[in-house]
Design a protein with these regions (language model features):
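Negatively charged, low-complexity tracts enriched in Asp/Glu with abundant Ser/Thr
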Residues: 1-49
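Surface-exposed beta-strand edges and flanking loops
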Residues: 5-7, 53, 74-76
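Proline-rich intrinsically disordered, low-complexity coils
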Residues: 9, 46, 56, 91-93
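Amphipathic, interaction-prone secondary-structure segments
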Residues: 35-71
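A short, surface-exposed interaction/processing loop segment used at functional sites
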Residues: 69-98
């Protein structure tokens, strides 16, 4: 499993990084592959984001940003974790509540 460290201080930086990483896994064009996201809430407070990339032939890859843990976990279409990004600097999960 590939583990790296990145500084992604804003939510937009985080989205862009996840989109590029998921597309690179299956050699997809980010301009042609939409990224969907959903808010993860724990005890009524936002704590992360769930990302899903839909590719050709019903291909779906996923990423989970665990805001409190400052890391992003990446999963392939079979559910196998293939990478992790640890954030040296990341957005505040509470920003998503606004």
């Amino acid at each position: 499993m590939d583990v790296n460290v990145a500084s992604l201080p804003t939510l937009e930086d985080l989205r862009l990084h996840v989109h590029q990483r998921l597309c690179a896994k299956d050699q997809l064009d980010p301009g042609q592959t939409p990224l969907q996201q959903a808010l993860i809430v724990r005890a009524g407070k936002p704590c992360g984001l769930f990302f899903q990339l839909g590719g050709p032939r019903l291909l779906k890859t996923y990423a989970l940003w665990a805001g409190e843990e400052n890391r992003i976990l990446y999963y392939d279409a079979t559910g196998l974790r293939f990478a992790e990004t640890r954030l040296s600097e990341g957005p505040d999960p509470q920003e998503m509540a606004a």
